[in-house]
Amino acid sequence: MNTKLSRKWGIIGACAASLAMLAAMPAAAHHSFAMYDTTKSKTLTGMLTRFLPGANHAQILFSLMDEKGKVMLDDKGKPVMWGVETGPAALIASKGVTVKAFPPGTIITVTVHPLRDGRNFGTLARGTGIVKCGTIMPQGGCTEKTGEVFLEMPQ
């Protein structure tokens, strides 16, 4: 009888351990940041075109601007587009970064670790945040001195 009871509790324990491992899998399934070159940083200013809140990471898409507030164009006359990946939507919303707070037309400055493959996309660099400067480029550009800093990333 003792053997059957021990065996039963052993099976229950193994099932509980398996369930605990399965519950931890979503966190372990998180993607790698190896696609970003964390040895390089680019500070970019642009006009927000789209804010995409996502369960895993929110993305902000913007048209690159020069220091005078003019949207930069590529050789085909189209706006030079960039994107930045931030933290989870729930986390950044708790820090004031929401679709409502960052509507299209908002001028922002971000520092990113760019993709290694050269495409115009990056992840928000550690020790930086998103600088929001309204809808008109401030004199001297969109900087921490002329705008409001949101979502400062830890070092």
Regions found by a protein language model. Give the residues of each.
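Short N-terminal segments immediately surrounding and downstream of signal-peptide cleavage
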Residues: 30-45
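Conserved hydrophobic positions within beta-strands
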Residues: 46-48, 107
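Short, basic/aromatic beta-hairpin or loop at an interaction surface
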Residues: 76-89
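Short nucleic-acid-contacting surface segments enriched for D/E, G, S/T with interspersed K/R
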Residues: 94-110
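Sec/Tat signal peptide C-region and signal peptidase I cleavage site
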Residues: 25-29
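OB-fold/S1-family single-stranded nucleic acid-binding modules
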Residues: 115-149
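Short aromatic-glycine-enriched beta-strand elements
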Residues: 54-67
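Bacterial N-terminal signal peptides that target proteins for export
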Residues: 2-17
